């Protein structure tokens, strides 16, 4: 037998011992890793079920007709809600059931913050009902009368009139630019023998406008341009019913 091929037992023992130590070390490392993962899972479960995971801050943006508290209640998101139980899509669905809300975007910000961004339907006017104002939205729906009479959004006030004519006017108001819409203080339906669609407008700039429901939005496009031609301090009537011109009011008319 070739002596070079003979491996003595004494030479193998240290190698076997080292291998056992290495294996034992690997087992210990894996055991520590598993215990650490288990510990983290236990901590997460405790945090998930404890008040520590509850929402700490809810920020609401874009709401005019609902208080922040109403938004939170209707969304289903409150300070007693766990951050991990909040489903943004569900909260958005809950809020879009409100007739004044056009769109909602709910964002979660780890670890405990919720942002609710609301887009309301445009307020195109307020219907005066026995001295109480009822918001009228661009989707044709009305809200409950305002409890304190304060206008959350600048828009014209008008008396209720024929439903058919109201619908026509609403369709025209939707076409107005925000700047012109905010300039209108009050709209009065004032039909004449010659024009059953006649309207009288009282503007925030102090002027009176005579116009009509038909092509109302198109006629009102001339209003900002006419304003630039009026001398300060003059009391004039702006006629947009046929063409576009101004008429200075006389002494008797000023008295009225």
Curated annotation (Swiss-Prot):
Cell division recorded as keyword: yes
Topology term for the membrane: Single-pass type II membrane protein
Keywords annotated in UniProt: Cell cycle, Cell division, Cell membrane, Membrane, Transmembrane, Transmembrane helix
Cysteine disulfide links: none
Record-level GO BP terms: FtsZ-dependent cytokinesis
Main localization (coarse): membrane
Domain POTRA, residue spans: 53-121
Ranges per topology, Extracellular: 52-256
UniProt subcellular location: Cell membrane
Side of membrane Cytoplasmic, spans: 1-30
Pfam families on file: FtsQ_DivIB_C, POTRA_1
Ranges that cross the membrane: 31-51
GO CC aspect terms: cell division site; plasma membrane
Family: Belongs to the FtsQ/DivIB family. DivIB subfamily.
Annotated HAMAP family: DivIB
Function, as annotated: Cell division protein that may be involved in stabilizing or promoting the assembly of the division complex.
Annotated protein name in UniProt: Cell division protein DivIB
Source organism of the structure: Bacillus cereus (strain ATCC 14579 / DSM 31 / CCUG 7414 / JCM 2152 / NBRC 15305 / NCIMB 9373 / NCTC 2599 / NRRL B-3711)
Taxon lineage: Bacteria, Bacillati, Bacillota, Bacilli, Bacillales
Gene name per UniProt: divIB
């Amino acid at each position: 037998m070739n002596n070079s091929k003979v491996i003595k037992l004494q030479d193998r023992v240290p190698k076997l011992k080292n291998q056992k130590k290495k294996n034992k070390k690997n087992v210990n490392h894996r055991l520590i890793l598993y215990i650490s993962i288990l510990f983290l899972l236990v901590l997460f479960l405790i945090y998930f079920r404890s008040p520590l995971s509850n929402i700490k801050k809810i920020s609401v943006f874009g709401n005019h007709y609902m208080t922040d508290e109403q938004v939170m209640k209707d969304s289903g998101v409150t300070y007693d809600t766990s951050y991990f139980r909040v489903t943004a899509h569900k909260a958005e669905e809950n809020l879009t059931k409100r007739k004044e809300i056009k769109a909602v975007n709910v964002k979660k910000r780890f670890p405990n913050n919720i942002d609710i961004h609301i887009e309301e339907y445009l307020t195109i006017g307020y219907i005066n009902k026995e001295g109480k104002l009822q918001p009228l939205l661009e989707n044709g729906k009305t809200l409950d009368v305002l409890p304190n009479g304060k206008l959350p959004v600048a828009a014209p006030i008008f008396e209720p009139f024929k439903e058919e004519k109201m619908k026509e006017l609403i369709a025209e108001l939707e076409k107005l630019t925000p700047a012109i819409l905010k300039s209108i203080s009050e709209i009065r339906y004032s039909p004449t023998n010659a024009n059953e669609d006649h309207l009288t407008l009282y503007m925030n700039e102090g002027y009176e406008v005579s116009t009509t429901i038909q092509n109302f939005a198109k006629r009102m496009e001339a209003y900002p341009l006419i304003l630039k031609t009026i001398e300060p301090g003059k009391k004039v009537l702006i006629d947009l019913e046929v063409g576009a011109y101004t008429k200075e009011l006389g002494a008797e008319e000023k008295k009225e």
